[in-house]
C-alpha cells in the first residue's frame, strides 16, 4: 500500500472529530499545562504559510506534553473586532458580522486541514455578545475602582468616597490625574456632578482629554501602530494629532508592578528590556519655574537636577496647555503655523525623526537657582504625555537639546567635565558631552563635586528651598480606550445630565445595535449615532464610541479556562486549576501593546480576587516570520512595455510586484500575466534569450506584494504532515526565514520512506521479532534527541534526527514492533496524521494522542565502537572503526598497522603518535 496522504488525513481528522480526542476538562489527577497561541484576526485573505509557524510549534509542544501525562489546555479563537472588517463593510455595504462569520469559517477550515489539537468546544470570538459581556463587565469594575499606591492594589471607588467625606483628599497616596485639593466640608458641599467630575480623576477607567491620532477620512482615533508616515496604515488617509475627550484606562497606576514582576517571567531578555524601556522608570525631581513678568509658574520633570546651571532655554510640547499662556501676540502667527504643521506627525515619528524644528514663544522663564531669564521655545521633540510636557534644556549634555541650540543659535554652557578631560569651548564641539560621570563646573555651589554628589545635593537643596520635590516618573501612558468606530464592544455607559453612569451588571451584555451605515453621522458623531433607540429604557443615551481592538484580547486567555460560564468570566475552581498560561507563542510586535495591556488587566483582576495569579503568561516564545520571495517585473516609464531583468539597466524603469503564482524559477508566464489584470492585456515585452526573467527579493509575506503562498495548495500537493515538518525544518523557531519550496520534496520523500518501514506491497510488514542492539540504539538516540529538542524549542534539529533514524532502520530492514511502535509516538507531535493511521493499523488500543512518551535507556546509547579519523602530519588520510574501550596504546598500534597506513608511512618510523581517546589519531612522520 502506498502513502496516500489525502485519504489518511481525511479519515484521521474525521476520527478525531468523532471521538472528540482533544476535548479537555479539569482533571485533578493530572498536572495541568496551558499552551496558547496569540489568536488571529480573521482577515478575508485567509491564512498564508507564514501564519501557521507558531501554531505548529505550539501544537508539537502540546502533543508532547499530553504524551508526557499532562492535562493540556490548547484552545483557539478569533480576535474578531477591528478596523479592517469595518473598512470592508464601508466599501461593500456588507455587515461586518457577516464578513467576519465567513472569514472565521474559512480560518477554521484551514486550521483543521493542518491537524491542530485544539479543543474547539472552547472556541471564543471577541465579537460574540456572550464573550464581550465580560469585557464590558471588566470595564465597569475599572470604572468603579481606584488605585491605592500605599496598598499597591485597586480598591472600590466607594471606599474613596468615604475617605473624601471624612477628610477630603489632602495627603492621599493614590493614583490620580490633575485634581484640586479639597476638604471634607468642601466635598460634602459639592453637587453630584461636581463630585463625579472629581472622581473621574481617580477612576481606573475614566474620561479624559488626551492627544490622539485622529483620521478625519476614517472618522476615528487610531493607535500608533495603525499609523505609518503620517497616514493610516489602512487606506493611506492623512492622520493628525488632536485633543479629544476619550475613555482611558489608568495603566500608569500599575507601572511599578508591571516593571517589578517582569523579573518573575520566563521571557527573553530582549522582550523584557523592550517592556522596561516602554514603562520607562526614572528617578528625578519636579521643579517649578516662574514666567517672567507674570504671576504664573509651571512644573518640569528632570532626572538631572544637578545640571540646572547649564539650562539655557526651556521647551514646551506643542500640545501643552501652557502654549496659549506663554505665546506673545508678536509670536502668535508663527506659533499657530508651527502647531498646524506638528499636528500631522505622530508621536512615534516625532521620537524617531532627528530633524530640528521649533518656534520661539516670545516669553521667558526664571531659572529658580540662578534667577536668570531663559527663553521658552515650542518644539515637537518634547512630548506632552511624558513628565509634564515641558523640559529644561541643557544643550551641553543632551544630544537633541544640543542640535536644537545649534540650529537656533542658542547658548551652550558646559556644567560637567567628563573624567580625564578638561573644560573646553562648546562652540568647538560636534555633539553634546556625556554627563553620566565627571566633575561639576560653572555650577555655583556644586563646583568641584562629582556628578553623584551633585545630584544628591541638588535634590536636598530643592527640598529645603521648596523649589519642587523628588519624584519617580514613568514613561508609560494611560491607554486610550475609545474609538469612534462601529465594529467594537459597546461601552456599558449611559449619560445623565452630561455625566457618565455605569449600566447595571445584570443588563450586560449591551449588544451592538444595527445601523444603516458604518460611517460617522452627518453631524460628526460616531457610527453608533445612527442607531435607532440607542438609549436606556428611561431614555438616557448610551456612549457612542466603542472599545479598541485590544479590549477583547486583554483577558481572552482566562475565558478559555471556562468558556461556557454564564455567571462569571472564569470560575475560581477553573482558574485555580489552570492558573496561568504556561507557554504563550506569538510575535514580538505585541511587546508594547497587547502584552502590556494583558498584564495590566490580569493584575487588576488579581486585585479584585477574580484570578489567583498576578501574571498571565509564564513563558513567552516569539516565533520569527516566514518571509515571502517576491518577484518583480520592470515597466519602462510612461509605457506598457516590460523589460526583462538582465536588460533593465538600459531603460528608465519602475519595478512592480507580480503574483508569484504566475512565475516559475523567476521566469514569467507572459500569457498568464496578460490575463492577470486588465491593464496588462496589451502589454509588450523585451525578452532575453526568448524569456522574461523577473527580479526577486525576500520580503514580508503580504497580499499587497503578491507573494502569499496558500497552505491549502501545499497540503493539496504534499499533505498536512509534510507542511508541518517542513515549516519546522526551515530553521530555528525564533528566527525569520524565507519561504522556499526547494526542500519540501525531500521532507515528503522522508514520509514516504517512513511509511515504507510499516508497509510494503503485501501490506503491513511489522512483526514481533526481537529488536537488535543497533535498532535499539537508533531508536533510543532519537527519543533522547527529540525530547530535548522539543523542551528547548529546537524543532528544526529534530527533523534531521528523524531522517537519520529512518535511514538506519531502513538499512537494517527493521520490522520489530518494539522499535516501530515507539517510533510512531515520537514522530506523532510533528506528523500526527500518518502516525495516527499507522497506530490504528498496528491494532494499538486508543488514539496515539493519548499514548505515553517512551523513555530512553542510557544503556542503549553507549557506543560500542568509535570511528577514528587517522591523520598524517595533520591531514586526515583514512578512518578506522575500533572498540570504544580500547586502550590508547592499542589504538595507536591499530592505526599504524592498518593497511592504509603503509602508503603514508613510506617505510619510516613515526616521530610521534597522538591519540585523543574516542576522537582522533594524528601521526607525525
Curated annotation (Swiss-Prot):
Gene3D superfamilies: HUPs (3.40.50.620), Isoleucyl-tRNA Synthetase, Domain 1 (1.10.730.10). One of its GO terms (molecular function) is ATP binding. InterPro entries: aa-tRNA-synth_I_CS, Leu-tRNA-ligase, Leu_tRNA-synth_edit, M/V/L/I-tRNA-synth_anticd-bd, Methionyl/Leucyl_tRNA_Synth, Rossmann-like_a/b/a_fold, tRNAsynth_Ia_anticodon-bd, Val/Leu/Ile-tRNA-synth_edit. Signal peptide: none annotated. CDD domains: Anticodon_Ia_Leu_BEm (cd07958). Keywords: Aminoacyl-tRNA synthetase, ATP-binding, Cytoplasm, Ligase, Nucleotide-binding, Protein biosynthesis. Pfam families: Anticodon_1, tRNA-synt_1_2, tRNA-synt_1g. It comes from the Bacteria. It is found in: Cytoplasm. The keyword Cytoplasm applies. ATP binds at residue 703. A motif ('KMSKS' region) lies at residues 700-704. Belongs to the class-I aminoacyl-tRNA synthetase family. This is Leucine--tRNA ligase. It comes from Porphyromonas gingivalis (strain ATCC 33277 / DSM 20709 / CIP 103683 / JCM 12257 / NCTC 11834 / 2561). The lineage of its organism: Bacteria, Pseudomonadati, Bacteroidota, Bacteroidia, Bacteroidales. The gene is leuS.
Amino acid at each position: 500500500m502506498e502513502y496516500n496522504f489525502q485519504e489518511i488525513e481525511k479519515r484521521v481528522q474525521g476520527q478525531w472529530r468523532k471521538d472528540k480526542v482533544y476535548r479537555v476538562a479539569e482533571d485533578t489527577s493530572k498536572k495541568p499545562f496551558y499552551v496558547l497561541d496569540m489568536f488571529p484576526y480573521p482577515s478575508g485573505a485567509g491564512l498564508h504559510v507564514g501564519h501557521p509557524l507558531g501554531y505548529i510549534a505550539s501544537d508539537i509542544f502540546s502533543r508532547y506534553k499530553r504524551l508526557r501525562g499532562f492535562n493540556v489546555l490548547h484552545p483557539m479563537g478569533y480576535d474578531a473586532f477591528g478596523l479592517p472588517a469595518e473598512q470592508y463593510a464601508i466599501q461593500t455595504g456588507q455587515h461586518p458580522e457577516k464578513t467576519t462569520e465567513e472569514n472565521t469559517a474559512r480560518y477554521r477550515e484551514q486550521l483543521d486541514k493542518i491537524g491542530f489539537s485544539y479543543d474547539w468546544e472552547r472556541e471564543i470570538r471577541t465579537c460574540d455578545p456572550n464573550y464581550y459581556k465580560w469585557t464590558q463587565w471588566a470595564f465597569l469594575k475599572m470604572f468603579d475602582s481606584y488605585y491605592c499606591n500605599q496598598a499597591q492594589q485597586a480598591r472600590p471607588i466607594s471606599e474613596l468616597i468615604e475617605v473624601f467625606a471624612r477628610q477630603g483628599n489632602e495627603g492621599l497616596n493614590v493614583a490620580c490625574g490633575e485634581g484640586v485639593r479639597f476638604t471634607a466640608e468642601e466635598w460634602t458641599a459639592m453637587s453630584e456632578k461636581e463630585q463625579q467630575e472629581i472622581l473621574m480623576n481617580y477612576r481606573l477607567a475614566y474620561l479624559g482629554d488626551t492627544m490622539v491620532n485622529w483620521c478625519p477620512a476614517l472618522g476615528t482615533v487610531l493607535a500608533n501602530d495603525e499609523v505609518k508616515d503620517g497616514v493610516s496604515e489602512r487606506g493611506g488617509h492623512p492622520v493628525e494629532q488632536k485633543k479629544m475627550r476619550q475613555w482611558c484606562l489608568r495603566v500608569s497606576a500599575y507601572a511599578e508592578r508591571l516593571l517589578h514582576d517582569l523579573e518573575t517571567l520566563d521571557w527573553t531578555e530582549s522582550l523584557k528590556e523592550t517592556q522596561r524601556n516602554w514603562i520607562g522608570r526614572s528617578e528625578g525631581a519636579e521643579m517649578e519655574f516662574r514666567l517672567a513678568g507674570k504671576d504664573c509658574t509651571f512644573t518640569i520633570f528632570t532626572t538631572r537636577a544637578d545640571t540646572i546651571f547649564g539650562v539655557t532655554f526651556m521647551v514646551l510640547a506643542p500640545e501643552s496647555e501652557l502654549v496659549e499662556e506663554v505665546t506673545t501676540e508678536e509670536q502668535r502667527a508663527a506659533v499657530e503655523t508651527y502647531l498646524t504643521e506638528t499636528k500631522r506627525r505622530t508621536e512615534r515619528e516625532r521620537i524617531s525623526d532627528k530633524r530640528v524644528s521649533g518656534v520661539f514663544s516670545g516669553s521667558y522663564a526664571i531659572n529658580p537657582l540662578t534667577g536668570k531669564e531663559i527663553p521658552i521655545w515650542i518644539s515637537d521633540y518634547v512630548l506632552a504625555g511624558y513628565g509634564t510636557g515641558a523640559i529644561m534644556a541643557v544643550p551641553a549634555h543632551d544630544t537633541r537639546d544640543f542640535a536644537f541650540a545649534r540650529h537656533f543659535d542658542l547658548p551652550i554652557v558646559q556644567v560637567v567635565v567628563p573624567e580625564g578631560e578638561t573644560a573646553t569651548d562648546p562652540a568647538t564641539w560636534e555633539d553634546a558631552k556625556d554627563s553620566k560621570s565627571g566633575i561639576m563646573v560653572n555650577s555655583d555651589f556644586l563646583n568641584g563635586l562629582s556628578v553623584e554628589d551633585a545630584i544628591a545635593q541638588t535634590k536636598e537643596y530643592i527640598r529645603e528651598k521648596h523649589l519642587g520635590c523628588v519624584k519617580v516618573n514613568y514613561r508609560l501612558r494611560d491607554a486610550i480606550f475609545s474609538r469612534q468606530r462601529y465594529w467594537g464592544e459597546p461601552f456599558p455607559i449611559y449619560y445623565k445630565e452630561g455625566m457618565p453612569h455605569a449600566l447595571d451588571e445584570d443588563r450586560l451584555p449591551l449588544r451592538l445595535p444595527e445601523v444603516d451605515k458604518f460611517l460617522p453621522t452627518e453631524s460628526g458623531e460616531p457610527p453608533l449615532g445612527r442607531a435607532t433607540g440607542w438609549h436606556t429604557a428611561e431614555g438616557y443615551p448610551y456612549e457612542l464610541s466603542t472599545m479598541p481592538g485590544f479590549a477583547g484580547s486583554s483577558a481572552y486567555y482566562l475565558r478559555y479556562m471556562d468558556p461556557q460560564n454564564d455567571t462569571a468570566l472564569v470560575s475560581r475552581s477553573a482558574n485555580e486549576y489552570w492558573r496561568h498560561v504556561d507557554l504563550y507563542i506569538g510575535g514580538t510586535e505585541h511587546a508594547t501593546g497587547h502584552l502590556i495591556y494583558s498584564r495590566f488587566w490580569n493584575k487588576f483582576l488579581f486585585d479584585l480576587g477574580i484570578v489567583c495569579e498576578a501574571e498571565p503568561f509564564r513563558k513567552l516564545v516569539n516565533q520569527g516570520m516566514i518571509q515571502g520571495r517576491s518577484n518583480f517585473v520592470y515597466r519602462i516609464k510612461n509605457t506598457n512595455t516590460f523589460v526583462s531583468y538582465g536588460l533593465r539597466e538600459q531603460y528608465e524603469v519602475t519595478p512592480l510586484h507580480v503574483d508569484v503564482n504566475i512565475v516559475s524559477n523567476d521566469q514569467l508566464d507572459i500569457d498568464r500575466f496578460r490575463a492577470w489584470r486588465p491593464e496588462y492585456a496589451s502589454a509588450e515585452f523585451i525578452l532575453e534569450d526568448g524569456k522574461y526573467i523577473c527580479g526577486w527579493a525576500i520580503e514580508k509575506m503580504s497580499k499587497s506584494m503578491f507573494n502569499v503562498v496558500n497552505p491549502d495548495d501545499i497540503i493539496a500537493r504534499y499533505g498536512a504532515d509534510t507542511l508541518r515538518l517542513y515549516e519546522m525544518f526551515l530553521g530555528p523557531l525564533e528566527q525569520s526565514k524565507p519561504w522556499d519550496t526547494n526542500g519540501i520534496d525531500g521532507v515528503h520523500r522522508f514520509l514516504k520512506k517512513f511509511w515504507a518501514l510499516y508497509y510494503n506491497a503485501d501490506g503491513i510488514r511489522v512483526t514481533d521479532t526481537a529488536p537488535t542492539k543497533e535498532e535499539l540504539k537508533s531508536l533510543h538516540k532519537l527519543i533522547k534527541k527529540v525530547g530535548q529538542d522539543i523542551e528547548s524549542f529546537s524543532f528544526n534539529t529534530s527533523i534531521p534526527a528523524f531522517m537519520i533514524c529512518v535511514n538506519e532502520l531502513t538499512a537494517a530492514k527493521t520490522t520489530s514492533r518494539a522499535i516501530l511502535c515507539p517510533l510512531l509516538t515520537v514522530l506523532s507531535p510533528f506528523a500526527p496524521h500518518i502516525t495516527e493511521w499507522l497506530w490504528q493499523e498496528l491494532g494499538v488500543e486508543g488514539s496515539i494522542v493519548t499514548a505515553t512518551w517512551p523513555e530512553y535507556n542510557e544503556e542503549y546509547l553507549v557506543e560500542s565502537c568509535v570511528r577514528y579519523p587517522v591523520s598524517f602530519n595533520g591531514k586526515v588520510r583514512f578512518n578506522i572503526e575500533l572498540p570504544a574501550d580500547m586502550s590508547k596504546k592499542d589504538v595507536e598500534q591499530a592505526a599504524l598497522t592498518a593497511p592504509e597506513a603503509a602508503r603514508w608511512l613510506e617505510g619510516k618510523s613515526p616521530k610521534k603518535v597522538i591519540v585523543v581517546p574516542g576522537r582522533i589519531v594524528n601521526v607525525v612522520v
